[in-house]
Amino acid sequence: IMFRQERGALMAADGYSRMNNRRKFGVVITQGGPGSENAMGGLAQAFGDNVPILYLPGGPALAQHSVQPNFSPVRTYQSVSVYSEVVWKSDMAASVMRRAFHHLRNGRPGPVIVGGLGTAVSITSVRSGDCAPGPALA
């Protein structure tokens, strides 16, 4: 669903997670810069109310990630999330998303943030075998 304002998108994802008794969770994707900055209120509310939401913020290209004045939502929103991580290379995407879903389903409920899924990662091809889960631990 397309929203005109990021806070409204977070509120809808919050409501979806609550209506599904936290067994299913809302997912929000925003543009970088002002779009990810506007998500703060919704993330803080979800964190305070223990509502699981997967947030995928847009951001600068990975080569410009630490260049000032670029805004880093993953770093900025660590205090209002139960888990946050950046996908630095395309071959990390499967394992990062696996950890993100683990945190959404286990432990204290709350927002999980995965950044870095911009053009540098999304246009890189990955072999399908790379996405298979690892062996079970005894």
Language model features by range: what are they?
Residues 1-138:
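N-terminal alpha/beta PP-like core and its mobile active-site loop of ThDP/TPP-dependent enzymes
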